[in-house]
Amino acid sequence: MATIQLTDQQRKVLHEVACTTAAPVLDTASKDKIKQLLDDYDMRKAAMGSKPGANMVLPGQVLGEAGPFLDYGHPPGVALGDKFKDRGQVMVAGVHGTTVRGIHAPNAGSEHFVRGAYSVLMSGVYVDDEDMGEAFWYTGEGGMDGKKQVKDQQMASGSNAALKNNCDTRTPVRVVRGFVQEAGGGEGGGGGEGGGGAKKGKGGKGGGKKEKGLVYEGLYLVLECKMEPSKDGPQVCKFLMHGLPGHSTVSAKVEYNIFGNAGSAYSLHARRLAGAGAPAGGKRARKAAQDEKARELARQWMLSEIRRQYPGPELQLEDVSGGQEAVPIPVINQVNSERLPTDFAYTREYAWAPGVYQLVAPALRLADEEMLQFSREGDRGGVCGIAFNRHIAALDRRLEQEGRLPQGYEAHLEEQYNAAGCLMVTDPCGVHECGDGCSAKACRRNMQLSAGVQLPLEVFMTESKGWGVRCREEVPAGAFVCCYVGQLITDAMAEVRKGVDHYLFDLDFFAHIYAEIAEKGMQAVAEEIPLHKIPPVLSVGMIRQAQINAADAARRLPEQQPQQQQPQQQQQQPAAGGAAPGGAAAGEQAAGGAEGGGAYGGGGAAAAATAAGTAPGAGDNMDGVEGPAAQRSGGEEAAAGPGSSGAAGGCGYRLDGMVTREGLAQAAHALAEACDALARSVADGASTNLGGENILAAIEAAKARAAAAATTSGGAAAADQHQLEQLDRAAALAAASKAAADAVKAGDPGAFYLQPIISRDEEKAAERAAAAAAAAAAAAGVPPALPSTSDVGNGGTTGSGGGGGAFSNRGPAGCAVGSPRALAARSGMEAAAQAAGGAASGPVAGPGAVEDHGEEYAPMLVIDARTTGNVGRFINHSCDGNLTIQAVFAGVYRSTLLYHVGLYACRNIPQLEELSYNYGYHKQQQQQQQAQRGGAAEKQFVMQCNCGAVGCIGNLM
């Protein structure tokens, strides 16, 4: 399928018009009015039965004297992506004011005529329409006899002249597309080739019942108009239309806090993506390689092609991945002599900072258990994304039959990748890929991220932005490019690196969802997205509670435990392929009606624990853990059954058989060394090799240097003040980690789990460290007494006075962190209701003190790709990027705390065009400003943005 290339001037025009165009009016009154009109139309139509032409007469009767909507822009009460059953509904809603013609334009004598047409409808009648989704060539009206063009069209009069006026006056036009949707899933646009659905996706053709309808695509700008011969011979009018950024479904930016039809990057369409077929087999031999020998031959051929294309010194490395990726990724520098950082190590999968996995394993285990129940893997016997999709789609259909499906919500797709392996739509609730045990064709296609990098990417030196990434081939919209991976550190550790490390990526995709629920309220969210689709997310209080329970269980570990047979070397991450340990069920499985289903034991935490080795202290391996709670069935809550198995709740939490005191001591020591190195890197600016035995003394020296430099100017003083604050954070983190390691060594293994994980806990870090030292000195070697789990939420403490001890369960300012909750099994709706502050069933408490100290939902883990990462680490920011971010549950990472960050093409990308995505600096600024309400303003890190986009915001945080 051909790609429309826009000029810089055309992109500039699009941006200028988008900035001056009013947003859709979606207030309750407007939406209620549209719903009332549509209900009236449907009732009248049902009463008329199958009378011919009913949908042509009824709209006028319903609208009465008001008549159709005769204005430009978005019709009030209609959202992007809203679907309609027929042209009558479209007219009643004010989207397209005629049921007969494809172009709705004012009369020639009207004052509106000079501005242009109101709307156009893509029905597929004209064979000369060329539909590329975000842009298309629209054929004018006239000269048709049946389905054949028999006469020349005229540009000088009628509706065609009106569309030409749209081009001249830069007036956006509403676009409505017809589609054909099979009972099995795929969706095809009437004007294009159609979508790749579940069966025979091209053109929307295939088996099963077909349902025709129309969808409001939003506002498009007419960029060009011309006359050219039609396929039948006579001249036709052609109009180049392109989606208006932010005002059309194919180019609307989706923020994490929007549940509606415009989501976290570009919304992709099945109809547009279906035409992007897979490349020819001869072009990329790796596609045909089925065995290791064939893959190696293909790899050697690709390496020879790279050497042939870059024969000179500009080829610095033939493959930066060192053979880890299926395709070699060369490093090219044709600009200067700069080379890659010498301390950079390539990894295809996540790597864990020393001691971090062991620290967060209890929270990961709980998140895995909740996700296990939400995805109903226990019912299917394994991980099958297709089965999950079909289950959610079935629940959507049930809501639709009951008339409770949110207006404007697009039903969940049973397959999220089309036949070419391209993502058909971004999903704010995450994409579920299949596991290794799945063998059906549809399941294998549902493993795009799991397969790793498949495109011929290059790391290259740009003119002004350092290293960047490009592809030697055209990238079709929706194609998987790569993940963003690196070393996993805690949020508290990442906070220390703020301003020093520009390769940090918060795993907060789903934390935004629940923060939005808390802000909007349950009812508002339920009107935008079915609650059964929202995955479970652990709040800050629940994460802290899981750590407290683990600490309590660790203190009950026996002093001496029998030695277990251990692997000789402990790994720090799961296998590169992301495959979970343990056998996979062979053959196809009828899991929920899916074409095959996979199975492998345990969740992400379990798999990661096994892959990380079973050494004492390596973390939970899930052995002996009870199965998930009984699954619910039927109703809207059928898929929303996240909950704990009880093993993590209260005093029932057990660690025996999984970790040992010796193992925890080793993990605590490793983490303390990692935090020490991290603090040194802050004190030394960026280096991780700061001299000096005492990190606290080194930081004090750095603070003295910063204070001395602060006398030069007001600006320098402000900058140094922030540096002083960062040094304080670094000192607090290092002190808390060392105090925890000392406490574990002295005989209190529970102290390991009570270290700061989320950055807000750092405020208490120094106090905990000081209390630890005082308690240790007072007890003369006796470990400090810590509160038991029974004290949680009751204000009770033991041991070190009212302060709660060195590693107590008390948060900043002595408040209980999140009023830690009893972790009873909850449905997705109950969890969401809890997020909104509503009542929840069972003993689950309200948000409590969490809200008093910032957001209730925050990331626990952060990706740091500064020295350890993959090709995604080199992809630059752009205010108008051509890639989009999508959270993907795949491999062993299948919880909302730990998942894959996938980067997908959000439009067709020409070969050798630099790949980029929006880092979200503007969102960070907004969040920081919100966090500063009522407090002192914090120094923001400002860098110049060199992305070159038309709508560049200029400065980055």
Swiss-Prot record:
Protein's recorded name: Histone-lysine N-methyltransferase, H3 lysine-9 specific SUVH3
Function: Histone methyltransferase. Monomethylates specifically 'Lys-9' of histone H3. H3 'Lys-9Me1' (H3K9me1) functions as an epigenetic mark of repressed chromatin.
Region annotation (Disordered) ranges: 182-209, 552-595, 611-647, 783-805
Source organism phylogeny: Eukaryota, Viridiplantae, Chlorophyta, core chlorophytes, Chlorophyceae
Effect of deleting the gene: Loss of function mutant (T-DNA insertion) releases the transcriptional silencing of tandem transgenes.
Reaction(s) catalysed by this chain's protein: L-lysyl(9)-[histone H3] + S-adenosyl-L-methionine = N(6)-methyl-L-lysyl(9)-[histone H3] + S-adenosyl-L-homocysteine + H(+)
Organism of origin: Chlamydomonas reinhardtii
Domain SET: 455-920
Entry keyword set: Chromatin regulator, Chromosome, Methyltransferase, Nucleus, S-adenosyl-L-methionine, Transferase
Domain Pre-SET: 319-441
Domain Post-SET: 941-957
Localisation: Nucleus; Chromosome
